[in-house]
Curated annotation (Swiss-Prot):
Its main location: mitochondrion. Residues 564-594 are annotated as: Type E(+) motif. It comes from Arabidopsis thaliana (Mouse-ear cress). Transmembrane segments: none annotated. Residues 1-80 form a transit peptide. Belongs to the PPR family. PCMP-E subfamily. This is Putative pentatricopeptide repeat-containing protein At3g25060, mitochondrial. One of its GO terms (molecular function) is RNA binding. It comes from the Eukaryota. Pfam families: E_motif, PPR, PPR_2. The lineage of its organism: Eukaryota, Viridiplantae, Streptophyta, Embryophyta, Tracheophyta. PPR repeats lie at residues 49-79, 80-114, 115-149, 150-180, 181-215, 216-250, 251-281, 282-316, 317-347, 351-381, 382-416, 417-452, 453-487.
Amino acid sequence: MVQTKHFCMLHRTLLCPKRIKFLQSISKLKRHITQIHAFVISTGNLLNGSSISRDLIASCGRIGEISYARKVFDELPQRGVSVYNSMIVVYSRGKNPDEVLRLYDQMIAEKIQPDSSTFTMTIKACLSGLVLEKGEAVWCKAVDFGYKNDVFVCSSVLNLYMKCGKMDEAEVLFGKMAKRDVICWTTMVTGFAQAGKSLKAVEFYREMQNEGFGRDRVVMLGLLQASGDLGDTKMGRSVHGYLYRTGLPMNVVVETSLVDMYAKVGFIEVASRVFSRMMFKTAVSWGSLISGFAQNGLANKAFEAVVEMQSLGFQPDLVTLVGVLVACSQVGSLKTGRLVHCYILKRHVLDRVTATALMDMYSKCGALSSSREIFEHVGRKDLVCWNTMISCYGIHGNGQEVVSLFLKMTESNIEPDHATFASLLSALSHSGLVEQGQHWFSVMINKYKIQPSEKHYVCLIDLLARAGRVEEALDMINSEKLDNALPIWVALLSGCINHRNLSVGDIAANKILQLNPDSIGIQTLVSNFFATANKWKEVAKVRKLMRNGAMEKVPGYSAIEVNGELRTFLMEDLSHHEHYHMLQVLRNLKTEIRDVCSGVE
């Protein structure tokens, strides 16, 4: 009798929906969930209370029982928007975007009106698979149901556009939004930064500040990336100072971004200091430092960092290995480059980015055939892949092969861009193919509607000047109003020196001085021209300018790998312990070359 009374009291207690919800929230085992499920079925609560059904599904999802959650969902005789949303959340947390989209379609088919949460989560599911078309269809439906100005829905659409590379669409939508929160602003800043549109990222950040929104860590990360891409040291250091002053947590992601930013703006020593002070380092952190060394021409340090990284148990990822390949390219370390190639094939799947880095490395190390072999094995070749191979042949001055590759690229329905034509024109310039260079320059403008940049004009002027057609090159400079482009005048002056055209060279040299170059190399070129023309007053003037500017030419150097060790030789460096022996070897080689040449004649 007492037991029956106790059971009845317990039964009445559990009939309260709040009690059931409490039990669901603290249940961490499947058997507890199934017991509650059985109880609510027996009491009819599953039929009468949609909140209980929703919470039961959520409880299943919380403990990872996705299939059981779906079983509960499917057995419900009636399903409202809250129940659908609960099941969608379970699939979202379980990283199953396809099921989210199927549930959304089922919901629409059953004529159940979605709410803000439904649209937001469904668009996020489209983002997971970068299904832009489906995402736009969901967005249209959201507009139809009156969620055009819902900040959560709009924010998810902005994110989808950004991740799918639809920057213009994102900007248009952002401009039409009636209300914007900090998440929307952050999405725009970080989206443009990650897409390499750093100026836009900074522009939106400044607008964000003007609107009175605070700066969080995510925005700061976007700004650090933009600072590095733009080479804006002042902004990068300002962000670093802000992070320090405000006491925002300096976790490994923030510190790695600082290393990356300082390396990109050329402050590699600061990047090294930030890295050395990091409490925790990841493979990504090491990759940023190694890439930084490579970008700043410190190949030896890049190699040393890779060795240290591996000794500490970190395995380099593809980003790190690309940085090592860049270092190999700088010093012509073919042996190390091949080792990296083998490591990639053994540990990673070769993607297009890494393949192009390998092609570039082999080309700069003199193994052009290896570059072509990798190129041929790339499955779906994109524009970057074609441009890289064209550039590889261009470096070696193989103009005819560049033209052949260009034609194959267009036959593959790949549209060339400004970089393609820059490589094409450069190769033709080094090959001395003037008529072909002029032809393809015209094709670029008339057929592909690409407006020539300064780089294209430099290639064409260099092409004409190398061939001795300096008057024609000068006419082009004047007709195209290129008189303020320093690299163009330098290319013209080089041609004048080679072909001893003193009249045009005098014009070019004086124009270069008017543009006030800060490069000691360019000033030396001008001085050498005046010396060739016996204009010693002008020579003295240029040399005085060089002294007054307190400019010091960075000595040229060459590097070669000998028995696995990198040897570097500085110009006019007499400190090497085998200096005199090397000079003797060079003299012997010079004698042998002279003998061979005289024999050929």
